[in-house]
């Protein structure tokens, strides 16, 4: 059903189009009748309301205005050229940056070139300054020469009796000078060379040391008699007879002058004490060395080998029976002195027959 409807619609539209074409073909010969010639043909744009419905399909073709082809071409070429120049500048800048990164010497070359240009500019300015200075010096020298020459000219041209002013003198000078003929002007005279610089002052003579020489001049000097009334006079003879003493140098004075208490350094420092090594100073008697048994291979000494048995009266339990009051320790005294003191004491205090000295004392004295 829908296909049938679509086909009907298409046929109706086709019939309408055919009828419109027939109507347009009938109307067109009437409209194409020759019109009277116009003086200036002008394109008139008519509105859509004035155009009949049969000619509506011709309206778009009549109203189209084609632009100028040259303007369009110029516009597109300008745009393309701008894009090309921008791309070229970007590529050139990127290439320059890449070259500077790969070859850093190029940066130094550019800096050198800029420095050379600055030096050239400075040289030009210096040359200009020198030329200006030369011109100023030449002008000053010329003016000085003119000032020197003008008074002599005035004296020759103007009589002395007639005083004249500056204006009159100038007119007289101009009248006396012969007017040049109609000749080409002569070139200006060359400027005189600049005056030489003034000579440098001579250096001062070296100061000679004052030496008192014993020459004939001193002999010629007569010693003037001393005036008792006036002040005391010092003669040359007194100066020659003066004897000078050697003075101490600054270093010697510093050595002699004691240093202040704040700057004094300690005589013995901690480092000196740390570097000190003490030596053993034990002197053992020969008798004890003989009795002592020294084992060379062992570091620890066995005290049992150093002790020896002594004949001492012992109790049944084994303790020695010694009279401690009569024993001499020998501290601070030599054995000879202890024996002498003991004899003296015995003579002063005789012992009773019951008391008897133990045998240990004699053995102790013999040991000492």
UniProtKB/Swiss-Prot annotation:
Q: What protein is this chain from?
A: Proline-rich protein 11
Per UniProt, the short sequence motif Phosphodegron occupies residue numbers 293-299, 333-338
Q: Which GO terms describe its biological process?
A: regulation of cell cycle
Per the annotation, the residue ranges of the short sequence motif KEN box are 324-326
**Which spans does this entry mark as compositional bias, Pro residues?**
181-208
Position of sequence motif D-box: 304-312
> What does the protein in this record do?
Plays a critical role in cell cycle progression.
Record field: compositional bias (Low complexity):
350-368
Biased region (Polar residues) positions are: 166-180
